[in-house]
């Protein structure tokens, strides 16, 4: 991770990356031999998706996390082939997950368990995170495997390890590092006190946090604003075919409907929105409307394809999106 002092970098953190084996089966039948109509193998994990889409959009990032065994080596190989930089911790015991994703009259997933991650492995990750500089962006997303502490998000966001200068307990936001959190339930709500730069719940996750049912964008806005009052600087809520809502730290509420697309695959669409938001934010020198547009377009481009969003498709969809100011 060598670079010049002051050079900004995006880091993505995936605790349990996977090899995703995606198969299409016509009329799947339980207890019988089924033949695949199509199949592919791709690196899996929310943070990895963000890194791959950033690469597709022309932005560099460094993928962090834990890998193990032959599957871990395959994940890293494929990421590098897609243009991503990597700086993983390779753990000794076990192998990285193999997840089966089957498409047959709907989507079915069978996810593996992943390797054993030791306290020593965690210490190595924390050491890597100490090297982050002011202006960097750290994307933390996805679930926590059972071999990691339940408060792993908070440990990272609090950056509690002693700094080389001898200053303990320096938080990421206090160091000028912008954290992006894309997680569910208490993982998300417990992160708010660390003032993440961006959080991205989807509509279903927002409903789960507050125990409500939401349908319209104007119904989403007050709950997004509650999360902002709890500490998030910017709140981006994805709503599938209903579009998205962004509550910004500048006091604006932006809404947009999704461009008319035929949804092919929803896996990775939310991660693509995060990547697009960051790409748009950096390309516009911090303009939130531009970030919002690019995020929604990238998410839609992934949903309309069996592949993650590419630049050309994203830009075509971006031209079809209209942003308006939201109100309750």
Regions found by a protein language model. Give the residues of each.
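Short, small-residue-enriched loops and turns at beta-alpha junctions
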Residues: 115-118, 144-148, 187-189, 243-244, ...
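Conserved phosphate/ATP/ADP-binding segment of small-molecule kinases
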Residues: 156-250
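Conserved phosphate-binding/catalytic region of the ribokinase-like
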Residues: 189-190, 217-328
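Alpha-helix C-terminal capping segments
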Residues: 52-60, 103, 279-285
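Charged helix-capping and loop-helix junction motifs
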Residues: 123-126, 150-157, 215-221, 256-259
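Conserved N-terminal subdomain of the carbohydrate kinase-like
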Residues: 32-33, 56-137, 318-328
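Glycine-rich phosphate/adenosyl-contacting loop at the front of the ribokinase-like
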Residues: 1-64, 70-74, 328
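Short beta-strands and strand-loop turn motifs
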Residues: 109-111, 136-142, 182, 200-205
């Amino acid at each position: 991770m060598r670079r010049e002092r002051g050079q900004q970098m995006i880091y993505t953190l995936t605790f349990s990356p996977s090899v995703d084996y995606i198969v299409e089966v016509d009329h799947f039948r339980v207890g019988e031999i089924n033949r695949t109509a199509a199949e592919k193998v791709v690196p899996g994990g929310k943070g990895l998706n963000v890194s791959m889409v950033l690469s597709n959009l022309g932005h560099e990032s460094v993928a962090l996390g834990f890998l193990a065994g032959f599957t871990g080596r395959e994940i890293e190989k494929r990421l590098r082939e897609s243009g991503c930089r990597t700086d993983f911790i390779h753990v000794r015991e076990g192998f990285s997950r193999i997840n089966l994703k089957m498409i047959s009259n709907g989507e079915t997933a069978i996810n593996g368990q992943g390797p054993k991650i030791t306290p020593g492995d965690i210490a190595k990750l924390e050491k890597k995170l100490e090297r982050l500089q002011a202006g960097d962006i750290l994307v933390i997303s996805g679930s926590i495997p059972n071999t990691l502490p339940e408060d792993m998000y908070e440990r990272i966001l609090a950056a509690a390890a002693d700094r080389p200068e001898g200053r303990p307990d320096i938080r990421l936001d206090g160091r000028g590092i912008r954290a992006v959190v894309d997680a569910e339930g208490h993982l998300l709500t417990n992160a708010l006190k660390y003032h993440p730069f961006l959080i991205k719940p989807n509509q279903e996750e927002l409903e789960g946090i507050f125990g409500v049912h939401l349908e319209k964008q104007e119904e989403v806005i007050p709950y997004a604003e509650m999360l902002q009052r709890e500490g998030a600087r910017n709140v981006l809520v994805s709503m599938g075919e209903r579009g998205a809502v962004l509550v910004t730290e500048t006091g604006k509420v932006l809404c947009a409907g999704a461009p008319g697309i035929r949804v092919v695959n929803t896996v990775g669409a939310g991660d693509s929105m995060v990547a697009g938001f960051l790409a748009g934010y950096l390309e516009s020198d911090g303009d939130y409307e531009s970030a919002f547009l690019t995020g929604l377009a990238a998410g839609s481009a992934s949903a309309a394809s069996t592949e993650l969003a590419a630049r050309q498709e994203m830009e075509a969809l971006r031209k079809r999106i209209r942003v308006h100011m939201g109100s309750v």
